[in-house]
Amino acid sequence: MIIDLGNHTIECDFDPRIQCNNSAEKLPIEDIGFIYNCVFKQRSATRRSIEATREVYPEAKRYLVSDGGLDYSFLEDERLKFSMQEDTVSPIIKINESNFLDPINQVVTKRGMAATIRRLKEGLEFCEYPEWFCMTEPDVLIRGKVNYPVGAKLLGHRVNFAWYTKSWYDGFIGINNLLSQIEGTIPILRWGSVPVIGHTQTLLKGIEVYEKNFDILDKLSEQFHVPGTFDLFLPILFALAGEPEVFSDEYTECLRNPNWKTSSHPVVHQYREFYSNNDYYGDN
């Protein structure tokens, strides 16, 4: 079908203007592992987030990465593994639409994307390849069992859209031009998966496609200023496996929903009640 997006038209098999693309029927997620991609200095928030997941999924394993932050090895047990790695987030904060093509920023972006792939592989191995995985951060609160729409392989709320600005749209045309060179992929025009809750084997398929076609996909960093943030990079990996992000009405965000405390959403993002002023990335 031909879709009009402002001053642009695209041809695709689905309407990206539709945010809610899910089926009504849901099934519970029972077998899941948690990968904390980047905990920095958020000690109290990290502990609370982990405690919450244990209350809901006590048998799940958790892989925790501190990228240049505090040492969380004191949390280790048979179901939690800790890894101290380099800070790949602070340098990305300084990248914007004006400077992302600078050679040094290209290196930063590519390094961050490689770290995400590595952490996914390490985390899935430790979690023993559960049916589902959750790549998350300390500002996510899982306060109930999560369900998935039948047929979905990647959950999110699809709040971001490629035609937000002309520069974004141009960037996503570039991203999708790269994807179109690879058989079996689908376009990506909406995303917003924080935390990323996805089907493990589908993700592994996407990673395999990414690595086999790295000569093409290494150019992702040249199309858009933040292709490596994991809320976008993982949906790109799923698009490589032919699967879209599917809208989940079980997600909410504290900054968008003033009633989040009393809502029934099991997945809460932007939960920062346990953050301190020095918990954020940057120069502190």
Where are the regions that the model predicts?
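Active-site-proximal specificity loops/subdomain of glycosyltransferases
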Residues: 65-129
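Juxtamembrane luminal stem/stalk of type II transmembrane Golgi/ER carbohydrate-processing enzymes
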Residues: 1-28
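Short, well-formed alpha-helical segments that are part of the catalytic scaffolds
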Residues: 42-56
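A conserved hydrophobic helix/loop-capping motif in glycosyltransferases and polysaccharide synthases
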Residues: 32-41
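Short beta-strand-to-loop acidic/aromatic patch adjacent to the donor-nucleotide binding site
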Residues: 130-141
